[in-house]
Structure formats: C-alpha cells, structure tokens
C-alpha cells in the first residue's frame, strides 16, 4: 500500500524532523510517510527484533553472573539503562494512535488578524527552541555512543567470578565488547567477534536514539505549549484596550485597528461607510466551535452585536465590523486557551505512563549508581564509566522535570497577567472575561506520570532524595 504525499500543518510540520528521525530509527510511526508502508513496517519490526535479541542477551549475562556482588550490580545497571530504550520503543508502537492524536490537535490554522504578528513571533520562537533541543539531544546521544565504544578499548576486559568452593573471587577474560552480553557463539576473536562488535554498536546507537527521540517529542510538545501561553499573556493588554472601545470613549480609537508590526499603518478593517461591500475581515479563520471541537459542541458560535447600525451603539463610533473584531478578539483568546488546555491533557494521556516507567527505572538505577560511585578511587575506566552513567541518567530525568516545571510556571502566570492588565478600563464583557480567566487559571496546568506524580523540579528533588535514602540503606547492608 502506498501513501500519497500530503501537505502537513501545525505540530506535524513543526516536528517533522523529529518524526523523520524516529521513523529512520525504526519507530512504529507510519502515518506521515510517502511510498510503500509495508517496507516501513518490515523495517520497524526488524529493528524491534534486533533490539529485543540484544536486550535478552544482556539479561542472559545478568542471570548467569550473580555470584559476585559488584558484577551483579554493574550488570543490573546496564540492564536498567537499556530498559528505557526497550520500553519506550514498544510504548510508542502500542500507543501510536495517541501520538497521532496529540500531533493532530494543533492542525487547525486558527488566528486573529489583530494578533497574527504575536502568534507568528511566538510560534517561531517555539520552533527555534524545538529544533535546538533536537540538535542538542541528538549530538549528545551520538557523542555518548562514540565515548561508550571508545572506552571499550581501554582497561582490562575481564569480569569477576565468585567461586563458592573456595569462597574467593577471581577474574576471567571476556570479549572486548562495549556491552557485557551472553551469546550462543564464541565472541572472543575472529568473525564472531567483529559481528558481535558491529551488532552492539548498532544496538547502542539505535536504542539510545529511539528513547531520546521519544523524549524530545514530549519535551517539544511542552515547549510549544509554553510559548502559546506566552502568546496569550502578551496579547492580554492590547485585548483590554480594544474592549474598552465598546462602551468607553477612547480618543484616537482608530489607531487600535491598525497593524502595528513592521511600521505598517494599513488598516485591518476598511471604512465600511465608504466601501460597504468590502469583505476584508473574515471570521472563518477564528476558532469555529463546530469545526474545531467536534459535533458535541452545538451552541452557536456567532458573535453578538449591539446597536442599530453598529455606529451609534458605542461612544467611539465603531463600525459593525470593528465591533465584531473586538468581540472576536475575546473569543479568540478564550478558545486559544481552551486549545492549549486540550493539548496539555492529550500530552499527559499520551506520555504519562512512559514517564512513570522511566522514573521507576531511573530511581533504582540511580541508587545502584550512587552505590557504585562510592568505590571510585581514581579517574580510571571504572570511574569514568560510573560517572558517565550517572550524568546521563540524571540528565534524562532533569530534561523532563525542567520542561514540566516551566509549564507549571507559565500556566500559573496567566492569572497574574490577566490581573495586571488594565482590566478596569475595559468593557463589562472584558471585566467578566478577566474574572473567568482568573478563576480558570488558579490551578496550574501539569503533566503527571499516570496520576502518580507531577513532572516538575520538585519531582527531581524527590528522586534525588529517594536515591540518597536507598543509598544509605545499601551502605548499611554492605
């Protein structure tokens, strides 16, 4: 079956580099492809089988080397490290429809002519940040893989074996491979060794990229959401100035209906008295409830007007189209905020369970790494390996928490922005609008890990606290 080329919009277009990389590394995302889907599916299944076979080989090595505590701890850390990759690879495959739904939420090109410049500016800021995040994470991932493979050639390639008969621990030479794993063939030298080495290099690159690309998509969603909230806060003050023209005399009120960006003085709405047939202002592009929110919203979305001819109904002599623009601006703000709330809800539903699995695995892994770090006595291969594991694991957790925390801060500050604007100069509609906004935004938007925790910097501190607690228990049990 072939997929015809389509023109993408919204988040799908913004995140297309991320989506293409995820598809390139084998993720089960087949909706945004051109050409035969069957080849894509075979490629994804082949990657899944190869990743699982290597993961089972790592687990086999863990099961077969349980005699020595240090060896058991090191193998457990390695197994937990790659558990992230396997779980996220499978998670994206199982929940691909949720990813499609979240990506498709922002495909409606809703905008408002008065705030189009602000919308475009914050969208470009979000796009730049998302691309920068993708580049930084991918460069870090590739450098980590290179460092992992490079450090393999330093130090002794041995493992500790505990002899139950003599109650002593001795070392045994093992293949010089990036990852300790059990294979049904002898990988000490020759063709089996080179095959095993290439296989593990592939596994390192693909497994780490698969996990990190899924995480980058989650963080990009949060970045986009935060910039949308910045946009809503930024247009709050001009929105109040506009609304004041409905029932309060404002000198030079016509200046409010001119394009302020790039020094332009062109009118957004032409004088309908001179040219009554002009149709320069189209409300169709501004949040139509039926089109944007589905058939369950049956309330009419038309804007209310007052006065006989739209001129004598307000003290500033606004035309009918100007009145519609003011009221549509308030509608735009409310519907855009609802849109953001809907996006945040979809993000939590899509990635919440993956966050829960990640945090559970990371807590155990970080505890064992902290225990291993106490045995570092020099800056050798062992010390660099443990430090690398520790920094990488902490960076993954911190990445989630910093963006989740920013979402909380940005959504909380919406109420402050609404209260700080000149709402007392606005119309009665605007005052009611500000009151509703303050009530609605009292509770910050959050992303939870399957309802068990909230992703924030407090979670990062809690994880560190739990690691220290478990570490002290392990030290006492030593």
Curated annotation (Swiss-Prot):
Q: What happens when the gene is disrupted?
A: Impairs both honey and host odor attraction. Leads to DEET insensitivity.
InterPro entries, per the entry: 7tm6_olfct_rcpt
Its membrane topology = Multi-pass membrane protein
| Membrane-spanning intervals of the chain | 44-64, 74-94, 134-154, 188-208, 344-364, 383-403, 455-475
What are the annotated glycosylation sites? 167
Give the quaternary structure.
Answer: Heterodimer with conventional odorant receptors (ORs). Complexes exist early in the endomembrane system in olfactory sensory neurons (OSNs), coupling these complexes to the conserved ciliary trafficking pathway.
Tissue specificity, please? Found specifically within most antennal and maxillary palp sensilla, as well as in a subset of proboscis sensilla.
User: Would the keyword Glycoprotein be found if you checked this record's keyword annotation?
Assistant: yes
Primary location recorded for the protein, binned into one broad class: membrane
GO BP annotations, alphabetical order? eating behavior; signal transduction
Enumerate the Extracellular topological stretches: 65-73, 155-187, 365-382, 476-478
* Keywords (A to Z) from UniProt: Behavior, Cell membrane, Glycoprotein, Membrane, Olfaction, Receptor, Sensory transduction, Transducer, Transmembrane, Transmembrane helix
Location(s) in or outside the cell: Cell membrane
Instruction: Give the protein's recorded name.
Output: Odorant receptor coreceptor
Q: Does the keyword Cell membrane belong to this entry?
A: yes
The UniProt family comment states: Belongs to the insect chemoreceptor superfamily. Heteromeric odorant receptor channel (TC 1.A.69) family. Orco subfamily.
**What is a single cellular component term in the Gene Ontology annotation?**
plasma membrane
Q: Name one GO molecular function term.
A: olfactory receptor activity
Q: Which residues lie on this side of the membrane: Cytoplasmic?
A: 1-43, 95-133, 209-343, 404-454
Q: What does this protein do?
A: Odorant coreceptor which complexes with conventional odorant receptors (ORs) to form odorant-sensing units, providing sensitive and prolonged odorant signaling and calcium permeability. Orco is a universal and integral part of the functional odorant receptor, involved in the dendritic localization of other olfactory receptors. Plays a key role in preferred attraction of females for humans over non-human hosts for blood feeding. Human attraction plays a crucial role in the transmission of dengue and yellow fever by the mosquito.
Q: What else is known?
A: The atypical heteromeric and topological design of the odorant receptors appears to be an insect-specific solution for odor recognition, making the OR/Orco complex an attractive target for the development of highly selective insect repellents to disrupt olfactory-mediated host-seeking behaviors of insect disease vectors. Odor-evoked OR currents are independent of known G-protein-coupled second messenger pathways. The homomeric Orco channel is thought to be a cyclic-nucleotide-gated ion channel that depolarizes the olfactory receptor neuron.
